């Protein structure tokens, strides 16, 4: 089979104005970046206010292996299938960071015959939004150190500065640095760090904002440090938020691309899913819902982490609620959850994974059962999509199908969208359209007036399967301080591994009865959530021994090769 890049480069793309017209957008509504990419002016939201709202579908998954289970591919393939059935559909997905693109995971444009194109700019720079986020973030960092250098009028305690610097490349050497070396003219010496840009609170803010003025207010609320008296210091206190907003004036506009089959795709924002909420922008979804019959979006990683945050954070920010949920499962991942196989990114797969073994699938299906249960907590029907691989066997598929039905899935269908594009997603599309018509009420997991500790314990026990939560003394002090400072009504955005429903990536399947540890609690006041840290979560990845960057090059004709 052709590589993803070969397929993408062979595609005949429609002019972007024609793609926009499918959504009812005019030339005045878009700002073109060449023939195949455009930004959408936010004024369309005012013009389309009276349009009926389309159906809202969110794609999630079982706990993934490091290789991923095809969630983005399924999202795109479902959008293509709906379009083939004569529905006006649009997919809304995240823009990938260049860190994973050059590292282990590769790009995030989907795969096979269900991709967003043009693939190269999608994975590299696109319209520069991530760079704008980095510039806004680093401007605030510079203004903090500048304030300390020029007298520290706000009486900031330098040891409490929590605002980092960012770069959109995985670079472990920058995780811990010393700034201010070389004499007084370079500012006070202090320990600092770099994060990858998509872990920035600015990225989370951009993804959750509902407009330019809301963006300005959110940026102003960012807390960067404490005074020596313990009061929070904000970006507004430093008079940085206005300039940060100006840097993001273009980045706030969603990007319009297309799928391989020419249907519209909105690509916007890319917050980390295990640190932030891990979903594409509220604005892209709002525009899509005013323009299309069906909007298909995705949440990060498994239902325990990405879908829960989608419901408890993103839906609260947008005022929207999903009509149906698609949960992607693979035979490969369920075999891995049996504990009998190790899947490591960058290493060859165990050949036995390709052999027929329904018993191994049955040994790992507890994760599927748990993730369907988690997805159903929020009140909407769940369609399980079995993402088919060529080496799957009917006996293994039947195990997955039966377990998903027993877990309460509305429907279980096989998906062939990787190999067949939209044509391989007809059954999935039909099931999803039927699910959207089901009665039921969307319900967040917890009320916002619940205490921070009670919210955390609700997540740990109802979603992660823990028996109880254990806090370090520092985490307990931080929770008390945040509530005293007036942040107690914020939702929780748990920072934890994506490789297990628990905090420990080694715990496969559906762990239960364990102690869920919280070692630290941080505040993202601008984004509007509290994020406790459970386990070892890195905000700056490192490159593997053989990063994907080694394979990427230019051929004799100037075409990109090796990008995946």
Curated annotation (Swiss-Prot):
Residues annotated to bind ATP: 65-72
InterPro entries noted in UniProt: Formate_THF_ligase (IPR000559), Formate_THF_ligase_CS (IPR020628), P-loop_NTPase (IPR027417)
Source organism of the structure: Roseiflexus sp. (strain RS-1)
Keywords, sorted A to Z: ATP-binding, Ligase, Nucleotide-binding, One-carbon metabolism
E.C. number: 6.3.4.3
Enzyme class: ligase
GO MF annotation terms: ATP binding; formate-tetrahydrofolate ligase activity
Catalytic activity: (6S)-5,6,7,8-tetrahydrofolate + formate + ATP = (6R)-10-formyltetrahydrofolate + ADP + phosphate
Protein name: Formate--tetrahydrofolate ligase
Gene Ontology terms describing biological process: tetrahydrofolate interconversion
Protein's pathway: One-carbon metabolism; tetrahydrofolate interconversion
Family: Belongs to the formate--tetrahydrofolate ligase family.
Gene from which this protein is expressed: fhs
Source taxon at top rank: Bacteria
